[in-house]
Design a protein with these regions (language model features):
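A short, polar beta-strand/turn micro-motif
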Residues: 9, 17-88, 96-100, 133-210, ...
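Small-residue-biased low-complexity repeat regions
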Residues: 76-79, 99, 114-116, 201, ...
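Contiguous ligand/interfacial binding patches
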Residues: 180-189, 195, 203-258
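A cross-kingdom feature marking solvent-exposed beta-strand/loop segments within repeated
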Residues: 102-139, 225-258
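Fold-core signature of tandem repeat domains
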Residues: 92-94, 104-106, 123, 145, ...
Length: 278
Protein backbone atom coordinates (compact mmCIF):
# COMPACT_ATOMS: atom_id res chain seq x y z
CA UNK A 1 0.00 0.00 0.00
CA UNK A 2 1.23 3.49 -0.81
CA UNK A 3 1.02 5.63 2.29
CA UNK A 4 1.53 9.30 3.00
CA UNK A 5 3.50 10.41 6.04
CA UNK A 6 1.56 13.63 6.53
CA UNK A 7 -0.88 14.02 9.39
CA UNK A 8 -4.01 16.14 9.41
CA UNK A 9 -4.15 15.89 13.19
CA UNK A 10 -2.25 13.35 15.33
CA UNK A 11 -5.40 12.36 17.19
CA UNK A 12 -8.49 14.45 16.38
CA UNK A 13 -9.69 16.56 19.29
CA UNK A 14 -12.97 18.12 18.16
CA UNK A 15 -14.14 16.67 14.84
CA UNK A 16 -17.86 16.68 14.07
CA UNK A 17 -19.99 13.71 15.16
CA UNK A 18 -21.15 10.79 13.04
CA UNK A 19 -24.80 10.30 12.22
CA UNK A 20 -25.76 6.63 11.84
CA UNK A 21 -28.96 5.52 10.17
CA UNK A 22 -31.15 2.53 10.81
CA UNK A 23 -30.25 -0.78 9.17
CA UNK A 24 -32.74 -2.26 6.75
CA UNK A 25 -32.94 -5.25 4.43
CA UNK A 26 -31.25 -4.76 1.06
CA UNK A 27 -32.00 -6.33 -2.30
CA UNK A 28 -28.48 -7.75 -2.69
CA UNK A 29 -28.43 -11.52 -3.09
CA UNK A 30 -26.51 -13.24 -0.30
CA UNK A 31 -26.68 -16.31 1.87
CA UNK A 32 -26.23 -14.03 4.86
CA UNK A 33 -28.05 -10.99 6.20
CA UNK A 34 -27.36 -7.84 4.18
CA UNK A 35 -28.07 -4.31 5.31
CA UNK A 36 -26.98 -0.72 5.20
CA UNK A 37 -26.63 2.40 7.33
CA UNK A 38 -27.06 5.87 5.90
CA UNK A 39 -25.43 9.14 6.90
CA UNK A 40 -26.41 12.67 5.83
CA UNK A 41 -23.17 14.50 5.02
CA UNK A 42 -22.76 18.24 5.54
CA UNK A 43 -20.16 20.01 3.42
CA UNK A 44 -16.81 20.54 5.11
CA UNK A 45 -17.51 18.42 8.18
CA UNK A 46 -15.72 15.37 9.58
CA UNK A 47 -17.56 12.14 10.36
CA UNK A 48 -16.22 9.16 12.31
CA UNK A 49 -17.71 6.09 10.63
CA UNK A 50 -17.72 2.54 11.99
CA UNK A 51 -17.16 -0.46 9.71
CA UNK A 52 -20.14 -2.72 10.41
CA UNK A 53 -20.42 -4.53 7.08
CA UNK A 54 -18.24 -6.80 4.93
CA UNK A 55 -18.25 -7.61 1.24
CA UNK A 56 -21.13 -9.91 0.35
CA UNK A 57 -19.92 -13.53 0.61
CA UNK A 58 -16.66 -12.38 2.27
CA UNK A 59 -15.31 -15.23 4.38
CA UNK A 60 -12.73 -12.91 5.96
CA UNK A 61 -15.46 -10.39 6.85
CA UNK A 62 -13.60 -7.49 5.24
CA UNK A 63 -14.49 -4.90 2.61
CA UNK A 64 -12.77 -2.29 0.48
CA UNK A 65 -14.15 1.20 0.19
CA UNK A 66 -15.47 0.72 -3.34
CA UNK A 67 -17.70 -2.13 -2.18
CA UNK A 68 -18.45 -0.80 1.31
CA UNK A 69 -19.35 2.80 0.49
CA UNK A 70 -21.59 4.60 -1.95
CA UNK A 71 -21.93 8.37 -1.82
CA UNK A 72 -23.74 11.16 -3.62
CA UNK A 73 -20.97 13.60 -2.69
CA UNK A 74 -19.23 15.14 -5.71
CA UNK A 75 -15.91 13.52 -6.71
CA UNK A 76 -12.94 15.88 -7.04
CA UNK A 77 -9.17 16.25 -7.17
CA UNK A 78 -6.87 14.56 -4.68
CA UNK A 79 -4.38 16.34 -2.43
CA UNK A 80 -0.61 16.14 -2.82
CA UNK A 81 2.30 15.19 -0.59
CA UNK A 82 2.80 18.75 0.62
CA UNK A 83 -0.74 18.69 2.00
CA UNK A 84 -2.88 15.57 1.55
CA UNK A 85 -6.00 17.53 2.53
CA UNK A 86 -5.48 20.17 -0.17
CA UNK A 87 -7.73 18.82 -2.96
CA UNK A 88 -11.51 18.96 -3.08
CA UNK A 89 -12.24 15.24 -3.41
CA UNK A 90 -14.19 13.46 -0.68
CA UNK A 91 -11.54 12.00 1.60
CA UNK A 92 -11.19 9.04 3.95
CA UNK A 93 -8.49 8.80 6.60
CA UNK A 94 -7.69 5.44 8.18
CA UNK A 95 -5.67 5.38 11.38
CA UNK A 96 -2.45 3.40 10.97
CA UNK A 97 -1.40 0.65 13.35
CA UNK A 98 0.96 3.05 15.13
CA UNK A 99 -2.03 5.10 16.32
CA UNK A 100 -0.31 8.33 15.27
CA UNK A 101 -0.86 8.93 11.55
CA UNK A 102 -3.23 8.18 8.70
CA UNK A 103 -3.52 6.54 5.30
CA UNK A 104 -5.51 8.64 2.81
CA UNK A 105 -8.08 7.69 0.17
CA UNK A 106 -9.94 9.94 -2.28
CA UNK A 107 -13.13 9.78 -4.34
CA UNK A 108 -12.41 10.86 -7.94
CA UNK A 109 -14.02 10.66 -11.39
CA UNK A 110 -10.88 9.89 -13.42
CA UNK A 111 -9.78 6.59 -11.90
CA UNK A 112 -8.51 3.68 -14.01
CA UNK A 113 -11.48 1.59 -15.12
CA UNK A 114 -9.28 -1.52 -15.39
CA UNK A 115 -8.85 -1.16 -19.14
CA UNK A 116 -6.50 1.81 -19.15
CA UNK A 117 -9.31 4.35 -19.47
CA UNK A 118 -9.29 7.00 -16.76
CA UNK A 119 -13.04 7.48 -16.64
CA UNK A 120 -14.13 5.53 -13.56
CA UNK A 121 -15.65 7.16 -10.48
CA UNK A 122 -14.06 5.33 -7.57
CA UNK A 123 -12.04 5.46 -4.37
CA UNK A 124 -8.29 5.50 -4.99
CA UNK A 125 -5.16 5.71 -2.84
CA UNK A 126 -3.17 8.89 -2.19
CA UNK A 127 -1.35 8.55 -5.52
CA UNK A 128 -4.51 8.01 -7.54
CA UNK A 129 -4.01 4.27 -8.01
CA UNK A 130 -6.77 1.68 -7.78
CA UNK A 131 -7.24 0.02 -4.41
CA UNK A 132 -5.60 -3.34 -3.75
CA UNK A 133 -6.20 -6.21 -1.34
CA UNK A 134 -4.03 -4.37 1.19
CA UNK A 135 -6.61 -1.58 1.41
CA UNK A 136 -9.47 -3.66 2.82
CA UNK A 137 -11.10 -2.74 6.11
CA UNK A 138 -12.19 -5.23 8.74
CA UNK A 139 -15.36 -5.22 10.79
CA UNK A 140 -15.06 -3.22 14.03
CA UNK A 141 -12.61 -0.74 12.48
CA UNK A 142 -13.42 2.92 11.83
CA UNK A 143 -12.38 5.81 9.63
CA UNK A 144 -12.77 9.56 9.16
CA UNK A 145 -14.80 10.89 6.22
CA UNK A 146 -14.98 14.45 4.88
CA UNK A 147 -16.48 15.96 1.74
CA UNK A 148 -16.41 19.51 0.36
CA UNK A 149 -19.96 18.97 -0.92
CA UNK A 150 -23.07 17.82 0.89
CA UNK A 151 -24.62 14.47 0.11
CA UNK A 152 -25.24 11.07 1.58
CA UNK A 153 -22.87 8.32 2.66
CA UNK A 154 -24.20 4.78 2.63
CA UNK A 155 -22.30 1.82 4.05
CA UNK A 156 -23.72 -1.49 2.89
CA UNK A 157 -22.82 -5.14 2.81
CA UNK A 158 -22.94 -8.39 4.69
CA UNK A 159 -23.63 -8.42 8.42
CA UNK A 160 -21.24 -10.52 10.50
CA UNK A 161 -22.20 -14.18 10.66
CA UNK A 162 -20.43 -14.61 14.01
CA UNK A 163 -22.56 -14.80 17.15
CA UNK A 164 -19.51 -13.47 19.01
CA UNK A 165 -16.89 -11.10 17.66
CA UNK A 166 -13.57 -10.33 19.39
CA UNK A 167 -11.70 -7.05 18.94
CA UNK A 168 -8.21 -6.67 20.41
CA UNK A 169 -7.09 -3.19 21.47
CA UNK A 170 -3.36 -2.39 21.85
CA UNK A 171 -2.10 -0.74 25.01
CA UNK A 172 -0.60 2.72 25.30
CA UNK A 173 -2.09 4.34 22.19
CA UNK A 174 -5.34 5.62 20.76
CA UNK A 175 -7.42 3.19 18.72
CA UNK A 176 -10.68 3.55 16.79
CA UNK A 177 -13.23 0.82 17.56
CA UNK A 178 -16.69 0.21 16.13
CA UNK A 179 -19.42 -2.17 17.10
CA UNK A 180 -19.16 -4.95 14.45
CA UNK A 181 -22.94 -5.33 14.45
CA UNK A 182 -25.20 -2.63 12.93
CA UNK A 183 -27.01 -1.72 16.15
CA UNK A 184 -26.59 1.08 18.69
CA UNK A 185 -24.08 0.15 21.39
CA UNK A 186 -24.07 0.26 25.16
CA UNK A 187 -20.42 0.34 26.23
CA UNK A 188 -21.06 -2.27 28.93
CA UNK A 189 -22.78 -4.64 26.50
CA UNK A 190 -19.60 -6.26 25.15
CA UNK A 191 -17.51 -8.32 27.55
CA UNK A 192 -14.37 -6.40 28.49
CA UNK A 193 -11.16 -8.23 29.38
CA UNK A 194 -7.48 -7.41 29.78
CA UNK A 195 -7.88 -3.72 30.53
CA UNK A 196 -6.60 -2.66 33.95
CA UNK A 197 -9.24 -0.51 35.69
CA UNK A 198 -8.05 2.77 37.15
CA UNK A 199 -8.99 6.23 38.40
CA UNK A 200 -11.01 8.63 36.27
CA UNK A 201 -9.88 12.12 35.27
CA UNK A 202 -11.46 15.37 36.38
CA UNK A 203 -13.11 18.34 34.72
CA UNK A 204 -9.86 20.31 34.47
CA UNK A 205 -8.43 17.51 32.29
CA UNK A 206 -10.62 14.46 31.56
CA UNK A 207 -7.59 12.59 30.18
CA UNK A 208 -5.55 13.15 33.34
CA UNK A 209 -5.72 9.83 35.19
CA UNK A 210 -4.92 6.18 34.51
CA UNK A 211 -8.28 4.50 33.85
CA UNK A 212 -8.91 3.12 30.34
CA UNK A 213 -10.80 5.89 28.55
CA UNK A 214 -13.36 5.97 25.74
CA UNK A 215 -14.26 9.17 23.89
CA UNK A 216 -17.52 9.41 21.93
CA UNK A 217 -18.29 12.48 19.84
CA UNK A 218 -21.30 14.43 21.06
CA UNK A 219 -24.14 15.38 18.74
CA UNK A 220 -23.11 19.04 18.88
CA UNK A 221 -19.88 18.17 17.08
CA UNK A 222 -17.80 20.31 19.42
CA UNK A 223 -16.74 18.00 22.24
CA UNK A 224 -16.56 14.45 23.52
CA UNK A 225 -18.38 12.40 26.10
CA UNK A 226 -15.87 10.56 28.29
CA UNK A 227 -16.23 7.10 29.78
CA UNK A 228 -13.85 5.26 32.11
CA UNK A 229 -13.20 1.67 33.16
CA UNK A 230 -13.05 1.44 36.96
CA UNK A 231 -13.36 -1.22 39.68
CA UNK A 232 -15.31 0.77 42.25
CA UNK A 233 -18.54 1.36 40.35
CA UNK A 234 -21.96 1.00 41.98
CA UNK A 235 -23.07 -2.65 41.70
CA UNK A 236 -26.71 -1.61 41.86
CA UNK A 237 -27.02 -2.40 45.54
CA UNK A 238 -25.06 0.53 46.89
CA UNK A 239 -21.78 -1.39 46.98
CA UNK A 240 -18.97 0.28 45.07
CA UNK A 241 -17.27 -2.92 43.97
CA UNK A 242 -18.31 -3.37 40.31
CA UNK A 243 -15.79 -3.32 37.46
CA UNK A 244 -17.35 -1.61 34.45
CA UNK A 245 -17.48 1.46 32.23
CA UNK A 246 -18.93 4.58 33.88
CA UNK A 247 -19.49 8.19 32.83
CA UNK A 248 -17.16 11.08 33.65
CA UNK A 249 -18.72 11.47 37.09
CA UNK A 250 -18.43 7.79 37.95
CA UNK A 251 -22.13 7.05 37.48
CA UNK A 252 -23.49 3.86 35.92
CA UNK A 253 -24.33 3.97 32.23
CA UNK A 254 -27.89 3.74 30.93
CA UNK A 255 -29.15 3.33 27.38
CA UNK A 256 -26.70 3.38 24.48
CA UNK A 257 -23.62 5.53 24.04
CA UNK A 258 -22.56 4.85 20.42
CA UNK A 259 -25.04 5.25 17.52
CA UNK A 260 -25.50 2.84 14.61
CA UNK A 261 -22.74 3.27 12.04
CA UNK A 262 -20.47 5.19 14.42
CA UNK A 263 -17.14 4.45 16.09
CA UNK A 264 -15.31 5.64 19.19
CA UNK A 265 -11.81 6.35 20.44
CA UNK A 266 -10.28 4.24 23.19
CA UNK A 267 -6.98 4.51 25.00
CA UNK A 268 -5.72 2.17 27.71
CA UNK A 269 -2.35 1.78 29.41
CA UNK A 270 -2.77 -1.99 29.07
CA UNK A 271 -3.94 -4.01 26.09
CA UNK A 272 -7.42 -5.44 26.25
CA UNK A 273 -10.25 -7.00 24.32
CA UNK A 274 -13.92 -6.43 23.60
CA UNK A 275 -16.11 -9.46 22.93
CA UNK A 276 -19.27 -8.35 21.14
CA UNK A 277 -22.34 -10.57 20.91
CA UNK A 278 -25.76 -10.53 19.33
Amino acid sequence: MRESFYILFPIPTYPPPPYGGAVQADGITSANTVGYSGTAINAGQWYLVGVQFADVASKAETADFNSLISTTCTPGAIGDFSDPTWGNAPMIQVLKANGQSYTYYYYISDADDGNGNYTATAWVDDQGFSLTAADVQALSKGFWFKSHTAGTLTCAGQVSTLSEFERNVPGGQFEIVANPYPVALSLNAPTTSGFTPGTIGDFSDPTWNNAPMIQVLKANGQSYSYYYYINDADDGNGNYTATEWVDDQGFNLTGTQVPVGAAFWIKSLTAGKFTFGL
